[in-house]
Amino acid sequence: MRSVLTISVGLLFGLALSSVAHANDHKILGVIAMPRNETNDLALKIPVCRIVKRIQLTADHGDIELSGASVYFKTARSASQSLNVPSSIKEGQTTGWININSDNDNKRCVSKITFSGHTVNSSDMARLKVIGDD
Protein backbone atom coordinates (compact mmCIF):
# COMPACT_ATOMS: atom_id res chain seq x y z
CA MET A 1 0.00 0.00 0.00
CA ARG A 2 2.80 2.36 0.89
CA SER A 3 4.58 1.77 -2.45
CA VAL A 4 1.35 2.57 -4.36
CA LEU A 5 1.02 5.82 -2.39
CA THR A 6 4.69 6.69 -3.05
CA ILE A 7 4.29 6.06 -6.79
CA SER A 8 1.07 8.12 -6.90
CA VAL A 9 2.68 11.05 -5.10
CA GLY A 10 5.72 10.81 -7.39
CA LEU A 11 3.54 10.88 -10.50
CA LEU A 12 1.53 13.86 -9.25
CA PHE A 13 4.73 15.74 -8.39
CA GLY A 14 6.15 14.96 -11.85
CA LEU A 15 2.99 16.22 -13.55
CA ALA A 16 3.10 19.42 -11.50
CA LEU A 17 6.73 20.05 -12.48
CA SER A 18 6.08 19.37 -16.16
CA SER A 19 3.18 21.85 -16.25
CA VAL A 20 5.37 24.54 -14.65
CA ALA A 21 8.17 23.85 -17.14
CA HIS A 22 5.68 23.97 -20.00
CA ALA A 23 4.57 27.49 -19.00
CA ASN A 24 7.91 29.00 -20.11
CA ASP A 25 8.42 26.73 -23.08
CA HIS A 26 10.26 28.04 -26.13
CA LYS A 27 8.30 27.39 -29.31
CA ILE A 28 9.43 27.30 -32.92
CA LEU A 29 7.21 29.93 -34.52
CA GLY A 30 8.29 28.98 -38.03
CA VAL A 31 11.05 28.67 -40.60
CA ILE A 32 11.72 31.02 -43.53
CA ALA A 33 13.69 30.02 -46.64
CA MET A 34 16.11 32.86 -47.36
CA PRO A 35 16.60 33.58 -51.09
CA ARG A 36 20.03 34.23 -52.60
CA ASN A 37 19.08 37.78 -53.65
CA GLU A 38 18.25 40.55 -51.18
CA THR A 39 14.52 40.45 -50.45
CA ASN A 40 12.58 42.74 -48.15
CA ASP A 41 9.20 41.02 -47.93
CA LEU A 42 9.88 37.70 -46.20
CA ALA A 43 6.95 37.22 -43.83
CA LEU A 44 6.38 34.66 -41.12
CA LYS A 45 2.65 34.71 -40.42
CA ILE A 46 1.58 33.44 -37.02
CA PRO A 47 -1.70 31.55 -37.68
CA VAL A 48 -2.82 31.64 -34.04
CA CYS A 49 -2.30 35.10 -32.64
CA ARG A 50 -0.04 34.69 -29.60
CA ILE A 51 1.74 36.91 -27.13
CA VAL A 52 5.50 36.63 -27.69
CA LYS A 53 7.90 38.53 -25.43
CA ARG A 54 11.14 37.72 -27.24
CA ILE A 55 12.55 35.73 -30.16
CA GLN A 56 15.77 33.97 -31.14
CA LEU A 57 16.97 33.39 -34.70
CA THR A 58 18.93 30.36 -35.92
CA ALA A 59 20.59 29.91 -39.34
CA ASP A 60 20.37 26.46 -40.96
CA HIS A 61 21.96 25.30 -44.24
CA GLY A 62 23.99 28.44 -44.92
CA ASP A 63 24.89 31.88 -43.66
CA ILE A 64 22.31 34.66 -43.56
CA GLU A 65 22.65 38.42 -43.92
CA LEU A 66 19.79 40.45 -42.47
CA SER A 67 19.11 44.11 -43.16
CA GLY A 68 16.05 44.45 -40.94
CA ALA A 69 13.04 42.91 -39.25
CA SER A 70 9.66 44.08 -37.97
CA VAL A 71 6.97 42.56 -35.83
CA TYR A 72 3.28 43.26 -36.44
CA PHE A 73 0.64 43.10 -33.73
CA LYS A 74 -3.04 42.31 -34.04
CA THR A 75 -4.62 45.59 -33.01
CA ALA A 76 -7.27 47.89 -34.40
CA ARG A 77 -4.63 50.07 -36.07
CA SER A 78 -2.08 47.38 -37.08
CA ALA A 79 0.76 48.49 -34.81
CA SER A 80 4.29 47.39 -35.65
CA GLN A 81 7.75 47.53 -34.10
CA SER A 82 11.18 47.45 -35.77
CA LEU A 83 13.53 44.85 -34.31
CA ASN A 84 17.24 45.21 -33.70
CA VAL A 85 18.58 42.09 -35.44
CA PRO A 86 22.21 41.16 -36.15
CA SER A 87 23.45 41.90 -39.67
CA SER A 88 24.74 38.35 -40.15
CA ILE A 89 24.09 34.91 -38.69
CA LYS A 90 26.48 32.05 -39.48
CA GLU A 91 25.21 28.53 -40.21
CA GLY A 92 24.35 26.76 -36.95
CA GLN A 93 24.54 29.97 -34.93
CA THR A 94 21.66 31.15 -32.72
CA THR A 95 21.27 34.79 -31.74
CA GLY A 96 20.66 36.02 -28.24
CA TRP A 97 17.11 36.85 -27.24
CA ILE A 98 15.60 39.82 -29.09
CA ASN A 99 12.96 41.54 -26.94
CA ILE A 100 9.59 42.43 -28.40
CA ASN A 101 6.27 43.33 -26.89
CA SER A 102 8.06 44.74 -23.85
CA ASP A 103 5.02 46.61 -22.50
CA ASN A 104 3.80 44.06 -19.94
CA ASP A 105 0.69 46.10 -19.09
CA ASN A 106 -0.45 46.22 -22.72
CA LYS A 107 0.15 42.69 -24.00
CA ARG A 108 -0.35 42.57 -27.75
CA CYS A 109 -0.46 39.38 -29.73
CA VAL A 110 1.91 38.94 -32.67
CA SER A 111 0.29 38.33 -36.06
CA LYS A 112 3.44 38.27 -38.24
CA ILE A 113 7.18 38.94 -38.30
CA THR A 114 8.86 40.22 -41.47
CA PHE A 115 12.53 40.04 -42.45
CA SER A 116 14.77 41.65 -45.07
CA GLY A 117 17.83 39.69 -46.08
CA HIS A 118 19.35 36.87 -48.10
CA THR A 119 21.52 33.73 -48.11
CA VAL A 120 25.30 34.12 -48.43
CA ASN A 121 28.14 31.59 -48.90
CA SER A 122 25.82 28.76 -49.93
CA SER A 123 24.46 27.35 -53.17
CA ASP A 124 21.33 26.28 -51.27
CA MET A 125 18.82 28.60 -49.68
CA ALA A 126 19.56 29.05 -45.99
CA ARG A 127 16.74 28.62 -43.52
CA LEU A 128 15.99 31.12 -40.77
CA LYS A 129 14.35 29.43 -37.78
CA VAL A 130 12.36 31.75 -35.48
CA ILE A 131 11.98 30.64 -31.85
CA GLY A 132 9.55 32.45 -29.57
CA ASP A 133 9.28 32.76 -25.80
CA ASP A 134 6.12 33.80 -24.05
Swiss-Prot record:
Q: Which UniProt keywords apply?
A: Signal
Into which family does the record put it?
Belongs to the UPF0412 family.
Q: Which organism is it from?
A: Salmonella paratyphi A (strain AKU_12601)
Which residue pairs form cystines in this protein? Answer: none
Q: Which domain of life is it from?
A: Bacteria
Its protein name is: UPF0412 protein YaaI
- Does the keyword section mention Signal? yes
Record Pfam families: DUF2541 (PF10807)
Position of the signal peptide: 1-23
